[in-house]
Design a protein with these regions (language model features):
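Short, exposed beta-strand-loop hairpins at the edges of beta-sheets
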Residues: 143-167
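N-terminal secretory signal peptides that target proteins for export/translocation
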Residues: 1-10
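Mature extracytoplasmic domains of secretory-pathway proteins
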Residues: 62-132
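N-terminal export/targeting and maturation segments
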Residues: 26-84
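Short, solvent-exposed mixed-charge patches
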Residues: 171-172
Length: 172
């Protein structure tokens, strides 16, 4: 008897999942395809997404990246707060040109990100410990009593010379 109930429950669950898969409004994540990288933290599932900012067909020189929070597993987005922009996740332009910009995050000035086109796609390229890689994600491991102390940041990307996945760890 219990096995038949489990079988019915499993079938109902699978039917429910297939219904969800056919409903794009329920599963849609509002992240544009032109994002350069994301910044995740260990404290929760919210993350900051960095998108390319194009005006016409040229890179916006004063604001080459748009940064915003993706909250609740992708259910909604919010702009960065003043504190986020000035102290942590904001983008500072070091230099810019028509199709390239050098930027860094306000929290860490030692990692310069070169925004440029590579094979027709906008990417962020970082150089760290002799490796040049196309940036995909940064992950901050938070600690301390309130979870406000950054223990390390892992930088993930694809090595430009080998094409292999690569990770570098930054310890503040």
């Amino acid at each position: 008897m219990y096995s038949s109930i489990r079988l019915i429950s499993s079938r109902l669950f699978l039917a429910f999942l297939s219904m969800l898969a056919s409903c794009p409004l329920l599963l849609a994540i509002d992240i544009p395809k032109e994002h350069i990288f994301v910044f995740e933290r260990s404290t929760n599932t919210n993350y900051v997404c960095y998108d390319i900012n194009i005006e016409g067909d040229k890179l916006n020189q004063s604001t080459p990246l748009n940064a915003y929070w993706v909250i609740g597993g992708g259910r909604r987005t919010e702009g960065l707060t003043f504190f986020d922009r000035k102290m942590a996740f904001g983008v500072k332009v070091v230099s810019s040109g028509e199709n390239e910009a050098l930027v860094h995050l306000t929290a860490y000035k030692d990692l310069t990100i070169r925004i440029c086109k590579r094979d027709g796609t906008w990417v962020g390229i970082v150089r760290w410990n002799g490796h040049e890689m196309i940036l995909q994600k940064m992950f901050a491991q938070m600690g301390g009593s309130l979870g406000m102390k950054c223990e390390y940041v892992d930088v993930y990307g694809t090595d430009t010379s080998t094409g292999q996945a690569h990770r570098e760890r930054i310890t503040p």
